[in-house]
Amino acid sequence: MNGFSYHLRVCRTFQCIWVCAGCLWLLPFSYQPAEASTEAMVQRLEKLAKRSNPVRNIFLSSLRARMFAEQAAQATTQDKRMDLMLQEAVEWLQAGASEKAMEGFNAWEAMARQVAPDLYEKNHYLLKFYQSLCWIRVGEQENCLANHTTASCLMPIQAAGVHRLRRGSEGALSILKPALERYPEDLSLKWLFNIASMTLGHDPETVSNPWWIPASTWSSDADIGVFPDIAGSVGADVNALSGGTVLDDFNGDGLIDILVTAWGFHDSPTYLQNDGEGRFTDRTRESGLLELTGGLNMVSADYDNDGDIDVFVLRGAWLGSEGRIPKSLWQNDARGI
């Protein structure tokens, strides 16, 4: 079967069934057309995303940062305000807003030096750790993400993984060197120092430094060879949060396709169809899965015994009381394949 004919039919291949507490709700499947049950799930997921609570869900970092900023502005004591400022900066860092987080840590440092020197000394180590981490993340975002190579962020850093945009790692080293002089045995700071140094192309074998991790640390008695990263060259480089993966033949053409989910409330799955020529084509929209967001894990099986691979999607892991999110059963209805 050619890819174009599947392209026309794949929009009808998956329908969504609600699953709760381990029990299958058959009525939506039995009495609703695929489009109706899928739309019902889309609306349910949207409502849950809008109702998510940043107080209880510690992974809603952007919302939590804004929440702490509002609380800091309303704080009635200096200590409380400064505590909330630190929490806001940490949340911006976890949200991926590295430079905004840096601004927050720098603002806290300036205030603490001026009005609370004892508090500054008490939090000095933590502050320097986070400030250097902000710079490390800037370097990763500008190089590993925006200017990705097949060697990006693979340890130990090889020549192709050295950062072309150097300000992130250089900024980190400007903080880490004086911090390590004060905390010379701290392993976390040493680790960040080595990452920043390697991404700048510094060689531990030729540069004498007491904080280097020996190159022998990365050696192994077992040579398993090299697995080159070819995702970008075959159309399979998906940039998303952690999620599930199923590799199987979804359209019955004898070729292995790729289906991945992403954990975030608003993150769509990605369906990549094997074209038989060594590449994959994104067919997510045609598959009808685009708005069925979220999902940390997936399980594949032919639950209805029609010869097609179906997919069970699990949501809500690690979210505690916020994790009561309906699961999905995506029925592959590729009849005639």
Question: Where are each of the predicted segments found?
Answer:
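Amphipathic alpha-helical repeat scaffolds of TPR domains
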Residues: 35-52, 78-90, 121-158, 187-194
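Helix-turn-helix repeat elements of alpha-solenoid scaffolds
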Residues: 52-69, 96-111, 165-174, 221
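Short coil/linker segments at helix-helix boundaries
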Residues: 107-125, 133-178, 201-223
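Blade-edge motifs of beta-propeller repeat domains
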Residues: 205-240, 272-293, 328-337
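Beta-propeller blade termini
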Residues: 243-252, 273, 286, 295-305
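Hydrophobic beta-strand segments that make up the repeating blades of beta-propeller
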Residues: 245, 255-262, 311-315
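Short, solvent-exposed loop/turn segments at conserved positions within beta-propeller repeat blades
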Residues: 263-267, 320-325
